[in-house]
């Protein structure tokens, strides 16, 4: 007789969350579970995925995994802090559950302090903003996925696919992960954000002379530039 073990995953549908990622993850986990059900095994695992929307209260059935999806808005500053969401994440961590973030979702995770002293990633275009808000986090924006055991952070907006496959691999095995990736036409190979990021110079460093030079370079980038031109 086949024994079924359920892995409960909840995708947090916070205000401004990217809905295509929220429901895309649920579809991905559902597809992976269906593929796993077709495999002959003494032990069948199934992922049961759903959403979690505010207000965030104590969950009668705490999930095994909480996922903070990306956001397509600029709502990642202190004004978007949600004390109930912070409490939810801290409770999830204290009880030994897994917490994952994608893109701007890392800002919600950063507010908990759980990332302090640890390696993490977020969208490369948000790197400076994240560093300013969370100076104690060892941010590596070149990485698409940073798996630190009980916390997994993912980079760009579409990195929800990479995170989803990472979780399928962890809970259902590499064979099911590969089948799921093939079904969704996704390359499961490790990628890095640095291949996609553009150079965005920091302009908020407070050095007036350097800023003047940066502005000059921005307006003369198509011309030949010499050291005397910059002096």
Feature locations, PLM:
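N-terminal low-complexity or simple alpha-helical regulatory segments
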Residues: 1-48, 63-67
């Amino acid at each position: 007789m086949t024994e079924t073990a359920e892995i409960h995953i909840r995708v947090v549908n916070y205000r401004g969350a990217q809905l295509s990622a929220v429901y895309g993850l649920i579809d991905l986990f559902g597809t992976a579970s269906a593929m796993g059900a077709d495999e002959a095994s003494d032990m069948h695992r199934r992922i049961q995925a759903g959403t979690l929307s505010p207000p965030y209260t104590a969950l009668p059935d705490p999930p095994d995994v909480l996922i903070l999806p990306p956001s397509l808005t600029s709502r990642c500053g202190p004004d978007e802090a949600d004390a109930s969401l912070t409490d939810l994440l801290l409770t999830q961590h204290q009880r030994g559950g897994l917490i994952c973030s994608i893109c701007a979702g890392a800002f919600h995770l950063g507010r908990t302090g759980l990332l302090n002293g640890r390696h993490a990633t977020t969208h490369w275009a948000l790197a400076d903003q994240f560093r300013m808000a969370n100076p104690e986090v060892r941010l590596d924006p070149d990485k698409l996925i940073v798996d630190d055991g009980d916390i997994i952070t993912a980079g760009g907006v579409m990195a929800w696919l990479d995170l989803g496959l990472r979780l399928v691999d962890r809970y259902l095995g590499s064979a099911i992960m590969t089948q799921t990736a093939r079904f969704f036409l996704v390359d499961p190979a490790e990628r890095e954000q640095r291949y996609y990021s553009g150079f965005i110079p920091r302009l908020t460093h407070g050095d007036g002379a350097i800023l003047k030079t940066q502005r000059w370079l921005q307006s003369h980038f198509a011309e030949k530039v010499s050291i005397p031109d910059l002096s």
